[in-house]
């Protein structure tokens, strides 16, 4: 009974706004973290700011850069329900450790997911770097161990991703679309349309001259810039101005194979003034949020008369 506490609701109803728990920071992680040095895992760790045990990039997810020198290998082993790995550069294979199953051969631009109990040995044929996102911080907070696999290892080839994206671009209805992107899904999750039951992944094209209208959602986004030239950037802020733009926005300039965190609930928009197309890969915990019905995704949209509205469909 010594642990029991009683709080006045008026002073405990919103611990985040009261500063009792830390906000998820808008933070950038440069590509230099994985471009040099030895074979290693580099957690993109915000645990000290979040006030939780780490490593953790957000309260529920951990993003990492994995660098593997050519001819070398390392093991990833985490208590997760869902893992996602995107190959930024290099070629290699990922093999199950202490388990059956065929190895996954990968190259730059490929993406693959791994379920619970997936201890893997990643061997690089040449210098390689992967972006590794998983939900171990969520399980650590819940005090549980993942034992049941909700899906099987799944590979998304670069060619298939680009083919699906090109189909979206060629669709006549995309001429007025605010976003040109493909959501990566799994047949086991038809309701959420997400890549795992927890994780959400989108491969998006940012065309030349694009000025996307802002949108927001309650899931965190751990964004990886796949490729971009100077002049591509994201604007992030708390509120919208009367014209639908983001008020007092902070600018995040894109750098190839760098990552940044878009905190939940903030409006954000992507822009391309570089003269070259760019691509981005946001990873979110939106699979879980969609299942819980807490995603609350909203889009700013300009009406024909020039005014703006907020809608719950991308359009």
Predicted segments, located by residue:
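A short beta-strand-loop-beta hairpin characteristic of the jelly-roll/cupin
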Residues: 69-108, 225-256
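A short, N-terminal "cap"/entry segment at the start of jelly-roll beta-barrel domains
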Residues: 1-58, 143-203, 307-315
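Double-stranded beta-helix
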Residues: 125-171, 273-315
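C-terminal functional regions that serve as terminal interaction/effector modules
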Residues: 1-25, 36, 220-315
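Short, low-complexity cationic-aromatic patches
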Residues: 1, 54-58, 72-84, 118-126, ...
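Extended, compositionally biased flexible segments
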Residues: 31-41, 45-62, 75-99
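Conserved short histidine dyad/triad with adjacent acidic residue
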Residues: 41-52, 61-79, 202-220, 266
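Conserved metal-binding segment of the jelly-roll/cupin
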Residues: 69, 104-126, 133-136, 251-274, ...
